[in-house]
Amino acid sequence: MKYDTILVDGYQRVGIITLNRPQALNALNSQMMNEITNAAKELDIDPDVGAILITGSPKVFAAGADIKEMASLTFTDAFDADFFSAWGKLAAVRTPMIAAVAGYALGGGCELAMMCDLLIAADTAKFGQPEIKLGVLPGMGGSQRLTRAIGKAKAMDLILTGRTIDAAEAERSGLVSRVVLADDLLPEAKAVATTISQMSRSATRMAKEAVNRSFESTLAEGLLHERRLFHSTFVTDDQSEGMAAFIEKRAPQFTHR
């Protein structure tokens, strides 16, 4: 499939989506949001892909939503256009997704990064939800995912003031998984994605589902769901291979079945 605003590549069992609107600082217009979602969905159904990496340029991950596309909208226009419906489809991707962020990840860019399962940041990264400065509020999940990631007090601080935080503060707050030097960002992100992609495909998908369920259920419900997923791994070839390899003190050879 041909894309105009992103680049799609592969590295071993990793699908790589690179945001590519440099003239607009990777601002997320409706075309780009749809292309990111469509590419991720294509990679999600590819049996040879075990992880998806989303990244931008060294200077900017994504500077936010494309304000020029939204500025003149009426309520009816915004409601009918439903700019963010693509994000619901992206959230349904079952393959583990890793965001590799350098430079600015603001507004929709921060929200896109938070939709990923791991967020690896360069030491140059800056995060924020500055929508309040435009007379609006986060509209792509920022008020919900940011609060779950860093807690109410910190989320209120960022959303109500619109201030940005650097990579170190983002890591201390629990927003990012790890921080690396800018030159090491893509090698580190590829290494993490490759490690995940080499695990059992069904097991990583179930693990992602179990963790995500913890945000939407009681502890008792989450534990029951986890237990059922755990039991279901025992019908897979990968469970047999993984445990046999452990007993035999060798590396497992998963077939993703």
Curated annotation (Swiss-Prot):
Keywords: Fatty acid metabolism, Lipid metabolism, Lyase. PANTHER family: ENOYL-COA HYDRATASE, MITOCHONDRIAL, ENOYL-COA HYDRATASE-RELATED. Belongs to the enoyl-CoA hydratase/isomerase family. This is Probable enoyl-CoA hydratase echA8. Pfam families: ECH_1. One of its GO terms (biological process) is fatty acid beta-oxidation. The keyword rRNA-binding does not apply. Could possibly oxidize fatty acids using specific components. Its EC number is 4.2.1.17. The keyword DNA repair does not apply. It comes from the Bacteria. InterPro entries: ClpP/crotonase-like_dom_sf, Enoyl-CoA_hyd/isom_CS, Enoyl-CoA_hydra/iso, Enoyl-CoA_hydra_C. One of its GO terms (molecular function) is enoyl-CoA hydratase activity. The gene is echA8. It catalyses: a (3S)-3-hydroxyacyl-CoA = a (2E)-enoyl-CoA + H2O; a 4-saturated-(3S)-3-hydroxyacyl-CoA = a (3E)-enoyl-CoA + H2O.
